[in-house]
């Protein structure tokens, strides 16, 4: 049965789930969520898709699951890939997913939105400046963790890597330049070399160009 992922191209959290599905080899298809026209805020979406009013949402037959980290864990369990080779690795993957959700993706997603998807006169520069400082610290942690190693956990790509790269391939500015972090730069090349890898706007429907 084909898994369905409610998602949209601009969403780094959707990209984490989509890329896990893509690299796992499971059969899946994207279902476009028109976030910028308010679809996730409609009563119908809350009733029929996700009571939390968010994307991504994974649907596997009669079962549905929300939150990118939970979806990634489900994909690993279902496919036998990306989830580590032993309990210690699985916990270490979880540690990185939780760190990413709190320290990296939450800051990157909000900062990218404020810097690119709000009208220029509505962009809160003080908030953006604060966020950029937090992001620089997070990038430094990630870059240090990759010193002397190819992957964050174990000897192959895992959901730890996919979670932490979720926003880093986007072209819009949000305080990240690969050349400033050589270990991250090389790591992103390794991820992009994985069979089936695609960039966010190639993997999922929806992009800023659609609204231009």
List where the protein language model places each region.
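GST-like fold's C-terminal all-alpha helical module
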Residues: 88, 96-195
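A generic structural-conservation signal
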Residues: 30, 84-85, 155, 180, ...
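Active-site-flanking alpha-helical
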Residues: 76, 167-168, 201
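GST-like domain detector, emphasizing the conserved glutathione-binding G-site
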Residues: 1-129, 143
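Conserved beta-strand edge residues that scaffold enzyme active sites
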Residues: 35-36, 160, 205-206
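Terminal-tail/helix-coil boundary detector
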Residues: 197-212
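Generic structural signal for helix capping and beta-alpha/helix-loop junctions
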Residues: 15, 38, 188, 208-209
